[in-house]
Every structure is written in structure tokens, then in C-alpha cells.
């Protein structure tokens, strides 16, 4: 399959995808209820989409093309409420979080679709271990070249997105010490990491054609990059976030990314360069391991500061952009989150500490999702 033409899209429109956990109400382990839930939702009216994912213990909800924060919040809230109402008759719980805290990967099954079966055959047990849950945000770009500028410019802020959304400290019943352990599962795939540093669509197309000629990839879906262009939508897709515990936080983070994109496209505070990636992996690890308390190394100034402080410094620059986009409330929430140094990973650990039970903690995350 050749690289698709870059579709025209309205700049700075955005879309949000959330992968959600489906658990039974008996012991709060993952349960393969996606087909039952989708049948129960048949005929309901809502914007956006609700669809199956790689595991039948997972379901994805996604907005349509959103122009502002309020629209995304409304669309996701409606889908959340429909799903929660439908789940009651199925004895099913729905929750956010980047990993299920005690599920055993070998118990998982792979959804019966050609794409997912191909992934399972190609990657073996990695496909079952990929039962992790993320938030993806698409940002509309005015041109294909601008999409590559934005992809590499916004790459500096990947630690922000990871730390703000981090909600996956537990894996198979163990506290990993990470704020976001989910991304360790993604890193196992050979085409993960960062996109190649090219700034024109012609150069990107040449790279794609070479990779396809090797037989390593067939389409853009085979790249598991942290941020990737999506030519069929005319967007870039930011893919590093854990699924937050509430719709509210997911929308706050999406609006933050939208405001940051506007700032980068209109103000051009710097030009992306290859050296930006010298500290990329270190900064990414710090965000995964320590969340908002991790260290951020500035790629040009070579200074160090807490990730939370770097977020707060950028929020000042984003204020006029958030105002223009109608998302000052979201920016205020992001400021408060960064100032508190306390993300969803902190909440999950506290819930487990108080309940002395991972199962009860999952029950509480279901309540969080249903209420927020």
C-alpha cells in the first residue's frame, strides 16, 4: 500500500480516542464483554464512535472532529453515560487507567478481526501483553509539511503529556515504581519510539517508500511511534498518554495539546532540529518513571527542572492561545494538576493503600469513570 495523500483538514481541529477497560463486577478482573456491550448499545444516538479493540476486554470511544474543548467534553460525556447505563444490565464495570493492575496477560484473547489476528501472528505474546489502554489525540494540520513541523516541535513536550496522563503504576499485581508502566509494553514493538527527523512531505514519502520496499511495513498503521502523521485524516496523532481515570482529565489534556499546537504553529518559538532528540529518551523515561516529579532536560539550553515546573512555565505562554480556543478552563485544570504534582498514578496508589485491595481499587476506578 502506497502512502496515502495528506487529506485537507481544518487546522487545530482535534479528535480524542480513549481505550477503556471492561471488568466483571465479581472480582474486577478484565472480562471479554466488548461484543455484549456493543450489542446493548446498538441503536443509541451519539456523536463519535464506539468500537472494539485488540482484546474483547477493551473498547474504544472516539469523538468526531472537534473545534473546541466544550464539544469534546460533551461528546465523550454522552458516550460515557450511554456505556455506563448499558453496562448495568451486563454486570459489567468500565474504567480508565493505562494498565489493569492485576490481569494476567496470558489469559487474554485477541479480537477476531483480520488486522488483530495478523498482529497476533506477527508479534506473538507481545500482542496479548498489548492489552494496555491509551489516549490518542489528533490535531488537524494546514498542510503536510506543517504536520511534520508540528510533529517534531511538539515532540519536546511528550514528557508533559505522559506525566499529566500517567495512570498505570501496577502490572500483574505488582507496583512497578513507574507512573506510566504502559509505555514499556509499547516499547517492545520494533517500529515504536520516535518518527524519523524529516521536515518535508516529499522526504517523508521517500522514507515511507524505502521502508515499504524492505517489507518491514505495509502501511502507516505499522508504525507505533509516539507521534505519527495520519495522512488519511490530515492530522498528527499524539499516542503517548495513558487513558486517564475521567473524561474531564482526558479533555483537559487534549485541550492542552491543542493550545500547544496553536502556540507552536503561530508563534514559532523555535525550529525543530535533530539535536532535540539527544535528550528525548531520557526525558521520556523520567516522565514514565516519576511522572510530574521527573526531571526535564531542555534540549537547547541543557538546563534541568522538574517536569511539573516546565509545564507551569509553558502554561503562561499558552494562555492567549487557550483563550482564543475557548479552553481556559482546561488550562487552569492543567496548571492545578502540575502544581499539585499529583496525577492519576498517585490516586491509584492511594486507593490501593487505603483499601488494601487491588480489586477494590478497580471498583473505585469504575466509580471515578462513571462520575467524571
UniProtKB/Swiss-Prot annotation:
Q: Reaction catalysed by this chain?
A: L-cysteine + L-glutamate + ATP = gamma-L-glutamyl-L-cysteine + ADP + phosphate + H(+)
Q: What is its EC number?
A: 6.3.2.2
Keyword terms, alphabetized: ATP-binding, Ligase, Nucleotide-binding
Q: Which Pfam families match?
A: GCS2
Entry-linked InterPro entries: GCL_type2/YbdK_subfam, GCS2, Gln_synth/guanido_kin_cat_dom, YbdK
Q: Which SUPFAM superfamilies match?
A: Glutamine synthetase/guanido kinase
Provide a Gene Ontology MF annotation, just one.
Answer: ATP binding
Q: Gene3D superfamilies this protein is in?
A: 3.30.590.20
Annotated GO biological process: modified amino acid biosynthetic process
Superkingdom to which the source organism belongs: Bacteria
Q: What does this protein do?
A: ATP-dependent carboxylate-amine ligase which exhibits weak glutamate--cysteine ligase activity.
Q: According to its UniProt record, which protein family does this protein belong to?
A: Belongs to the glutamate--cysteine ligase type 2 family. YbdK subfamily.
Task: Return the protein name.
Answer: Putative glutamate--cysteine ligase 2
- The species this protein belongs to is Cupriavidus metallidurans (strain ATCC 43123 / DSM 2839 / NBRC 102507 / CH34)
Amino acid at each position: 500500500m502506497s502512502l496515502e495523500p495528506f487529506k485537507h483538514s481544518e487546522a487545530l481541529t482535534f479528535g480524542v480516542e480513549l481505550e477503556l477497560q471492561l471488568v466483571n463486577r465479581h472480582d474486577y478482573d478484565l472480562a471479554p464483554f466488548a461484543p455484549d456491550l456493543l450489542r446493548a448499545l446498538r441503536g443509541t444516538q451519539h456523536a463519535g464512535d464506539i468500537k472494539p479493540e485488540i482484546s474483547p476486554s477493551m473498547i474504544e470511544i472516539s469523538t468526531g472532529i472537534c473545534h473546541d474543548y466544550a464539544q469534546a467534553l460533551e461528546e465523550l460525556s454522552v458516550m460515557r453515560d450511554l456505556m455506563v447505563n448499558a453496562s448495568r444490565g451486563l454486570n459489567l464495570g468500565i474504567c480508565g487507567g493505562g494498565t489493569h493492575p492485576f490481569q494476567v496477560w496470558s489469559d487474554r484473547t485477541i479480537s477476531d478481526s483480520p488486522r488483530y489476528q495478523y498482529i497476533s501472528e506477527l508479534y506473538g505474546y507481545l500482542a496479548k501483553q498489548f492489552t494496555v489502554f491509551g489516549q490518542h489525540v489528533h490535531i488537524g494540520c494546514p498542510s503536510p509539511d506543517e504536520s511534520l513541523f508540528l510533529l517534531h516541535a511538539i515532540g519536546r513536550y511528550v514528557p508533559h503529556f505522559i506525566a499529566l496522563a500517567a495512570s498505570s503504576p501496577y502490572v500483574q499485581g505488582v507496583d512497578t515504581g513507574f507512573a506510566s508502566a504502559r509505555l514499556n509494553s509499547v516499547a517492545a514493538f520494533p517500529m515504536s519510539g520516535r518518527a524519523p527527523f524529516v521536515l518535508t512531505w516529499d522526504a517523508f514519502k521517500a522514507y515511507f517508500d524505502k521502508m515499504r520496499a524492505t517489507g518491514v511495513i505495509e502501511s502507516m498503521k505499522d508504525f507505533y511511534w509516539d507521534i505519527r502523521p495520519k495522512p488519511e485524516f490530515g492530522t498528527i496523532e499524539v499516542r503517548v498518554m495513558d487513558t486517564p481515570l475521567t473524561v474531564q482529565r482526558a479533555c483537559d489534556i487534549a485541550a492542552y495539546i491543542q493550545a500547544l499546537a496553536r502556540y507552536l504553529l503561530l508563534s514559532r518559538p523555535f525550529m525543530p532540529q535533530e539535536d532535540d532528540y539527544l535528550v528525548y529518551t531520557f526525558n521520556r523515561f523520567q516522565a514514565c518513571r516519576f511522572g510530574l516529579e521527573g526531571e526535564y532536560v531542555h534540549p537547547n539550553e541543557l538546563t534541568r527542572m522538574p517536569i511539573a515546573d516546565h509545564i507551569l512555565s509553558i502554561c503562561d505562554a499558552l494562555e492567549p492561545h487557550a483563550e482564543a480556543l475557548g479552553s481556559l478552563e482546561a488550562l487552569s485544570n492543567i496548571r492545578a494538576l502540575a502544581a499539585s504534582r499529583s496525577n492519576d498514578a498517585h490516586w491509584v496508589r492511594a486507593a490501593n493503600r487505603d483499601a488494601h485491595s487491588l480489586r477494590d481499587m478497580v471498583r473505585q476506578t469504575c466509580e471515578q469513570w462513571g462520575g467524571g
